[in-house]
Design a protein with these regions (language model features):
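Gly/Ser-rich oxyanion-binding loop with an adjacent helix/lid
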Residues: 1-67, 199
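C-terminal nucleotide
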Residues: 49-201
Length: 201
């Protein structure tokens, strides 16, 4: 999207619009119920913080930080996992979180105070199920963690940033449950890759 924007539109399309176009292509053309986070990060590049409270007008703020200056590099590992047949698994994540929001008569979880969520936990478990509850716990914790991560980078406290990122990873694994697809026993490629990375690093 960014390349096409520069080649054919004189870079006049905003980064948010490039991300929204990418999301539309995935949702409509490829039939994948994705959000805007990956598309926004790709459109902007480098490190960014994104506020999706207004999904039509996300607030995108670059975070000026050089990983190399701390002796680190961001690496992508080929775990061998194939998510071609996991559309329903990925769709279940926002679907279950929105189901909890709907319990409160709202569209998205950001419209519900965390205290109200925990106050109604027994009823939510009965209505929406435990996995939905766990995913909402991740949602609230992660939304609290992100500003701390950004602040740590801006303060130059890279060790604190890494610690918070590690917490995010564990939360994704434990609460969001996006590492091992439901029912997969023999093939858990991403989990194996995470285990080996933790062992060697």
């Amino acid at each position: 999207g960014t390349i096409i924007n520069h080649l054919f539109f004189e870079a006049k399309v905003s980064q948010a619009e490039v991300a929204q176009i990418g999301q539309y292509a995935e949702n409509v053309f490829f039939g994948k119920p994705c959000g805007l986070m990956d598309q926004t990060a790709s459109a902007v590049g480098n490190l960014v913080t994104i506020d999706f409270f207004d999904k039509e007008n996300p607030v995108i703020e670059p975070v000026d930080f050089d990983l190399a200056s701390c002796g680190h590099a961001l690496c992508i590992i080929d775990s061998g996992a194939d998510h071609a047949d996991l559309t329903d698994e990925y769709a279940a994540i926002p679907g279950e979180i929105k189901a909890v929001a709907a319990y409160f008569g709202k569209e998205v979880l950001t419209q519900i105070d965390e205290k109200d969520f925990y106050a109604k936990l027994p009823e939510i478990r009965k209505t929406c199920g435990d996995r939905a509850v766990m995913r909402c716990i991740h949602f609230y914790q992660e939304n609290a963690r992100v500003p701390q991560q950004v602040a740590a980078l801006r303060e130059g406290n890279f060790d604190k940033f890494l610690s918070l990122v590690k917490q995010s990873g564990y939360s994704s694994y434990m609460y969001l449950q996006n590492v091992i697809p439901a029912g997969y026993k023999a093939h858990q490629d991403v989990a194996v890759a995470l285990g080996l990375a933790e062992h060697y690093l």
